[in-house]
Curated annotation (Swiss-Prot):
This is Histidine ammonia-lyase. One of its GO terms (cellular component) is cytoplasm. Its EC number is 4.3.1.3. The gene is hutH. The lineage of its organism: Bacteria, Pseudomonadati, Pseudomonadota, Gammaproteobacteria, Alteromonadales. The keyword Cytoplasm applies. InterPro entries: Aromatic_Lyase (IPR001106), Fumarase/histidase_N (IPR024083), HutH (IPR005921), L-Aspartase-like (IPR008948), Phe/His_NH3-lyase_AS (IPR022313).
Length: 510
């Protein structure tokens, strides 16, 4: 259980990673309460003075010019939640929903949304009770915010919809009963405040970010293992090479390879006088490719961290000036572009891994037994495992197509440009799973290759990592049912055991 004390607008990437991985006990910094109350007072004043303000006493979208009678204001807020809960498809997992809820709490608590403290506290109560609304994955275009996902999240506050508790789907009414809550009657502006925002897109993006960091760590280890398994040179990782180019992420990537490979090993000493002049690109250019991927991970992380702490509601309430401004912070273009760029990194990490693995099974390049098995012909070894890796790499190439360039107008052309940030973030998990599968195959292949170099040893870190794998998967001495080996290697990667190999501060959330 992770105890999270929210100081609105100050969540860190390290905290966000923990939110994605652990059940929570959430509390709120008391200093934010005054700003929350002040924003609701501005909304109340607008109603008392009978002034027109979007979403408070008007319709929504193209119906913004429709004035709502005072007696219908509460009905308006309830109606927007119920009508906008129109998502479709598989449900988000609990971790994504929890992240979305915490991001919404963090945003609302900054005091620019005109929503009562009691509503924010109701969301916190659900999080603390580990009750997560059932939210379909599909149905948002990332402007005006993530309306459908956040509406599904909000239905439970009304005693409607469904929630998941201890792995079981229950009614919204039952969820409130378990949490010791009563259904909420939303005040003016509150339904819109709950629905408007980029929290679903950001939650998907953060989920992809943390997966990408884990993949980067594992891929660097696999790449280093493959260098020694293929009798590759350490010279391309020399710091001087990368300093003269100047890209910090490339410099850092080379540093990580040097850290894992160490200065030398018995394997590297064994071929210092070989006739090879230089290695194929998949070995030699790893810092350049992985450095570029690291840069995209860092860029995306910076954007996600800002967005996680942002106010993406509309309209915004500026209590100090008594102003309510209708604008467009709900437009998730920054997240869409961040997720698109992160998708490129995830795809390239997998693509490079597949090429390294293909090099290992090619006897003409690696000088290892063909397909990494003795008695080839009788045994096929890693032949089809490489085909699996190629299939996954190819899938990721299609999934990496930018989402943000594909806008479709909605709401009768009132919302005529949208971000598609939700899909941009959502596909990252599938891409990460594909890349993890590729890395699992390379991890097996690199360990197999190193075993063929026995009794020569690689670096201490690589030998330790290989031993961890060998606790789960034996040397492939002859053909056997291969899928369980890949599954075991994949599980090792899921456990993110290789993050410990990355020096502190080089990955954004670690």
């Amino acid at each position: 259980m992770y105890e999270l004390h929210i100081k609105p607008g100050q969540l860190t990437l390290s905290q966000l990673r923990k939110i994605s991985r652990h059940a929570l006990k959430v509390s709120l910094e008391s200093s934010c309460i005054e700003a929350i109350h002040a924003s609701t007072q501005v909304v109340n004043q607008v109603i008392a003075e009978n002034r027109v303000a979007y979403g408070i006493n008007t319709g929504f979208g193209l119906l913004a010019n429709t004035r709502i009678a005072p007696e219908d204001l509460e009905t308006l807020q309830r109606s927007i939640v119920l009508s906008h809960a129109a998502g479709i498809g598989e449900l988000m997992n609990d971790e994504t929903v929890r992240m979305m809820m915490v991001l919404k709490i963090n945003s609302l608590a900054r005091g620019f949304s005109g929503i009562r403290l009691s509503v924010i506290e109701a969301l916190m109560t659900l999080v603390n009770a580990q009750i997560y609304p059932c939210v379909p994955k599909k149905g948002s275009v990332g402007a005006s915010g993530d309306l459908a996902p956040l509406a599904h999240m909000s239905t439970v506050l009304l005693g409607e919809g469904e929630a998941r508790y201890q792995g079981n789907i229950i009614s919204g009414a039952k969820a409130l009963e378990i949490a010791g809550m009563q259904p909420i009657t939303l005040a003016p502006k509150e339904g819109l405040a709950l629905l408007n925002g980029t929290q679903a897109s950001c939650a998907f993006g953060l989920e992809g970010l943390f997966a990408a960091e884990d993949l980067f760590a594992s891929a660097t280890l696999c790449g280093a293992m493959t260098v020694d398994a293929a009798l590759g040179s350490r010279r391309p990782f020399d710091d001087r090479v990368h300093q003269v180019r100047g890209h910090q992420s490339q410099i850092d990537s080379a540093l990580i390879y040097r850290h894992i490979l160490d200065t030398h090993s018995e394997v590297s000493h064994s071929h210092t006088a070989c006739e090879k002049v230089q290695d194929p690109y998949s070995l030699r250019c790893q810092p350049q490719v992985m450095g570029a991927c690291l840069q995209q991970i860092r860029n995306s992380a910076a954007i996600y961290e800002i967005e996680a702490n942002s106010v993406s509601d509309n309209p915004l309430v500026f209590a100090e000036d008594g102003d309510i401004i209708s604008a467009g912070n709900f437009h998730a273009e920054p997240i869409a572009m961040a997720s698109d760029n992160l998708a490129l990194a995830i795809a390239e990490i997998g693509s490079l891994s597949e090429r390294r693995m293909a090099l290992l099974i090619d006897n003409s390049l690696s000088k290892l037994p063909p397909f990494l098995v003795n008695n080839g012909g009788v045994n096929s070894g890693f032949m089809i495992a490489q085909v699996t890796a190629a299939a996954l790499a190819s899938e990721n190439k299609s999934l990496a197509h930018p989402a943000c360039v594909d806008s479709l107008p909605t709401s009768a052309n009132q919302e005529d440009h949208v971000s598609m940030a939700t899909f941009a973030g959502r596909r990252l998990k599938e891409m990460a799973e594909n890349t993890r599968g590729i890395l699992a195959v390379e991890l097996l292949a690199a360990a197999q290759g190193l075993d063929f170099r026995s009794p020569l040893k690689s670096s201490e870190l690589i030998e330790t990592a290989k031993a961890e794998l060998r606790e789960r998967v034996d040397f492939y001495d002859k053909d056997r049912y291969f899928a369980p080996d890949i599954k075991q290697a994949n599980q090792l990667l899921i456990e993110a055991m290789h993050n410990k190999l990355i020096p502190e501060g080089l990955l954004p959330s670690l």
